């Protein structure tokens, strides 16, 4: 599910994707529920978690429209229910495929997963997501993250390309299946205390929510007179664009980001079944 995270300098509440404690899970669950309820009750308003943020964003866009200008923003999308082991450690990684799809959306200028650029300010001891065994397996399941009950559904399947297990095996599929059977008894109890990586490690899903943030640029077609060049005369020229202009396309791109993430993950799930 996606929401408008920011328009210009106006920010909505961010998804609580990183805290995987019982409290953090409940916060994310409540955010998703609130977002769904607001979207159904107010389909013509901006898709935000915080109603006040939607009002402030709308006013910000109106200001840009009156100035014959445009604004950009960011969109956050969290994908719950993604099983562990989807993707690969090289060019077919989950992040690779998602980024490729998301950059195919016009006006997308940035894509980051998990903490993204925020990870550059963290130490490894802060960013690394610690694993543990759940004291109570039932606590790892909630409706906001359907796969927590199957959290590392085949934890070793995520390591199916591990040379230590496949090096002398001529049937990698059988090897992966054997690892699944061996790990099934205990893998369901493995949980992550945090999710700074955004649900993907080494290109492979961890079973935690996949979190991605997308940056949308301001629309270039604006009412202002802009400096350009005349290639016929080889001289500077003024560019005037007439007609109606979108002051902001972020709200409309929100559902596109959500759809692209869903299609990409579904494609990868189908590939896993082949």
Model-derived features: where do they sit?
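Glycine-rich, mobile lid/loop segments that gate access to catalytic sites or pores
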Residues: 1-90
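Predominant activation on well-ordered alpha-helical scaffold segments within soluble catalytic domains
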Residues: 55-58, 96-103, 211-213, 254-267
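Short alpha-helical "patches" and their helix-cap loops
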Residues: 1-7, 116, 270-274
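Short, mixed-charge aromatic SLiMs
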Residues: 6-17, 124-127, 234-239
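Glycine-rich anion/phosphate-binding loop at the beta-strand->alpha-helix junction
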Residues: 67-142, 167, 171-236
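Generic recognition of cysteine residues
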Residues: 40, 47, 77-79, 100, ...
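Compositionally biased, intrinsically disordered low-complexity segments enriched
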Residues: 135-169
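Internal helix-turn-beta structural module
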Residues: 219-274
